From Swiss-Prot:
Subunit-structure text: Homotetramer. Monomer. Regulatory subunit of the sodium/potassium-transporting ATPase (NKA) which is composed of a catalytic alpha subunit, a non-catalytic beta subunit and an additional regulatory subunit. The monomeric form associates with NKA while the oligomeric form does not. Interacts with the catalytic alpha-1 subunit ATP1A1. Also interacts with the catalytic alpha-2 and alpha-3 subunits ATP1A2 and ATP1A3. Very little interaction with ATP1A1, ATP1A2 or ATP1A3 when phosphorylated at Ser-83. Interacts with the non-catalytic beta-1 subunit ATP1B1.
Name listed for the protein in its UniProt record: Phospholemman
Primary site of residence: membrane
UniProt note on tissues of expression: Expressed in ventricular myocytes (at protein level).
Length: 92
């Protein structure tokens, strides 16, 4: 009976050693997802803030341009409609 216990104990020890993972080399395709997530959130935040700034800057320039323009368009503008207006005002 003691022989059976020793045999079982040796077999269980061998199984435990077989199940224990040997140190493996680093897999080159294993990524640190926490760092990737943080980096992605930082880049997304920077792009979001830049987008808001661009939108606000365009809105400010459009308001500035419309406040500066009053009445008839400048004669320097080369649109067809402005050239017709200039010609029609000269005939009077």
């Amino acid at each position: 009976m003691a022989y059976l216990h020793h045999t079982l104990l040796v077999c269980m020890g061998l199984l435990a050693m077989a199940n224990a993972e040997a140190p493996q080399e680093q897999d080159p395709f294993t990524y640190d997802y926490q760092s990737l997530r943080i980096g992605g959130l930082i880049i997304a935040g920077i792009l979001f803030i830049l987008g808001i700034l661009i939108i606000l800057k365009r809105g400010a320039w459009e308001r500035f341009d419309t406040a500066r323009r009053t009445g008839e368009p400048d004669e320097e503008e080369g649109t067809f409609r402005s050239s017709i207006r200039r010609l029609s005002t000269r005939r009077r």
